[in-house]
């Protein structure tokens, strides 16, 4: 255990009023501070009714106190939770009294940080706590719960253990450099590395899916002015989120709206119409539209169904940045007769609703069917996890190449770097500044 000398305190429930509010203490003085509040006779993991008193003996609040002795607590330290009424005034007064008795205000994420430092959970699990709290839909919440339960970490550990075995074999071969690699089990090393690279590649694919589950997909509505992008966003969102007029260039800024697709969050981004010219404000809107495209997972290209080819030509190469695209011919209700349709386009009318069900189906297929389908054991992941796995994969591939030419020292270094990248995910090889950045994004009471 990495015991901390100080005792910390914070409100553990969400901001605002509620039926119940919780103040959490963690550290060696937790029980003594509780006693000074007037809470005597605490028993391990037993709820005890008490009145919480100030320095003059006046009652601050009454409620339940629970003691979790070390190391059998969330943080691994002595923990006392004070459960009273959810009044921010009373909770702040209770925290102030605890501070007067020797505790200090906890930093953001400090309870989870202590749990990590005391070996109660690893870094990926600690991050999953924040992801679980912030989950925007049920699937994201379930994925975060699996990461908190260690599903992601165990798979990282499995690859890490395989890399450890490989490093042992390669380092041993370096010590016996006069012997050919094949006489030292070179074939088995290459076979193990091939298997490890396959595990790593699959883990990377699953982590990419986990990142999308956590962050959702960003779909940018792009197209020329007056193609009906804002009307389409309103139709998909089921509310009038964007201003709609007959004047081309009405949309000047980006507008984000989240919708749910079978329990998966898709963020729609309405953007300014792309065209030549325009005033300074409209040109800034078009610049922002192109910037959104650079970050998009999916481009919804909205064209006027009455002349889609001309609208396509007006876009130029703006959509080349997004590999996944869905062509939408809007305003199909204004066609006197059905015109020629591109094979890859969907005809809709944002005004009448024609074709919207087909569009919803196609969006679900793109969002859920391409690497986002529901699978057993899916877990939550973050961009930093995906980045670390990418680097681990690159180093493992480089190690394979070095082994082919029997460059053992170079192969050993590449394996070490791959191992180090994996260690960043669970926190086994993380710099202090990285830990500080991660935990500072947590809630104060976590």
UniProtKB/Swiss-Prot annotation:
GO terms for molecular function: GTP binding; GTPase activity; metal ion binding. The keyword tRNA processing applies. It comes from the Bacteria. Its cofactor is K(+). GTP binds at residues 226-231, 245-251, 270-273. PROSITE patterns: G_TRME (PS51709). (6S)-5-formyl-5,6,7,8-tetrahydrofolate binds at residues 24, 81, 120, 446. One of its GO terms (cellular component) is cytosol. It is found in: Cytoplasm. GO terms for biological process: tRNA methylation; tRNA wobble uridine modification. InterPro entries: G_TrmE, GTP-bd, GTP-bd_TrmE_N, GTPase_MnmE, MnmE_dom2, MnmE_helical, P-loop_NTPase, Small_GTP-bd. Its EC number is 3.6.-.-. K(+) binds at residues 226, 245, 247, 250. NCBIfam families: mnmE_trmE_thdF, PRK05291.1-3, small_GTP. This is tRNA modification GTPase MnmE.
């Amino acid at each position: 255990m990495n015991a901390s000398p100080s005792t910390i305190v914070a409100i553990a429930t969400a901001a605002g009023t509620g039926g119940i509010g919780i103040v959490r203490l963690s550290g060696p003085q937790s029980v003594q501070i509780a006693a000074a509040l007037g809470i005597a006779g605490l028993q391990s993991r037993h709820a005890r009714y008490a009145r919480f008193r100030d320095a003059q003996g006046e009652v601050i609040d009454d409620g339940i106190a629970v003691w979790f002795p070390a190391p059998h607590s969330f943080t691994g330290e002595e923990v006392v939770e004070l459960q009273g009424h959810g009044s921010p005034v009373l909770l702040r007064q209770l925290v102030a009294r605890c501070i007067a008795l020797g505790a200090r205000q906890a930093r953001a994420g400090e309870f989870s940080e202590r749990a990590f430092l005391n070996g109660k959970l690893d870094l990926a699990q600690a991050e999953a706590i924040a992801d679980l709290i912030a989950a925007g839909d049920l699937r994201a919440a379930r994925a975060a719960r699996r990461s908190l339960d260690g599903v992601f970490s165990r798979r990282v550990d499995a690859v890490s253990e395989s890399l450890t075995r490989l490093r042992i074999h390669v380092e041993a071969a370096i010590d016996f450099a006069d012997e050919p690699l094949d006489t030292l089990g070179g074939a088995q090393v290459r076979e193990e590395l091939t298997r490890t690279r396959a595990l790593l590649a699959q883990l990377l694919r699953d982590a990419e899916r986990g990142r999308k589950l956590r962050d959702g997909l960003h779909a940018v509505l792009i197209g020329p002015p007056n193609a009906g992008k804002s009307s389409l966003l309103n139709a998909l969102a089921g509310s009038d989120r964007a201003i709609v007029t007959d004047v081309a260039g009405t949309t000047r800024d980006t507008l984000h709206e989240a919708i749910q697709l079978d329990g998966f969050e898709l963020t729609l981004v309405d953007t300014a119409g792309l065209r030549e010219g325009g005033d300074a404000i409209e040109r800034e809107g078009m610049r922002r539209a192109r910037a959104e495209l650079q970050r998009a997972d999916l481009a919804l290209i909205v064209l006027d169904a009455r002349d889609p080819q001309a609208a396509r030509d007006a876009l130029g190469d703006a959509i080349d940045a997004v590999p996944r695209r869905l062509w939408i011919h809007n305003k199909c209700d204004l066609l006197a007769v059905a015109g020629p349709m591109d094979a890859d386009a969907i005809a809709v009318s944002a005004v009448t609703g024609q074709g919207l069900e087909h569009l919803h189906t196609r969006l679900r297929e793109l969002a859920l069917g391409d690497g986002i389908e529901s699978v057993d054991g899916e877990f939550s992941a973050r961009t930093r996890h995906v980045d670390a796995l990418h680097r681990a994969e690159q180093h493992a591939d480089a190690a394979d190449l070095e082994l082919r030419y029997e460059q053992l020292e170079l192969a050993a270094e590449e394996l070490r770097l791959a191992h180090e990248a994996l260690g960043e995910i669970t926190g086994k090889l993380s710099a202090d500044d990285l830990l500080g950045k991660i935990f500072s994004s947590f809630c104060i009471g976590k």
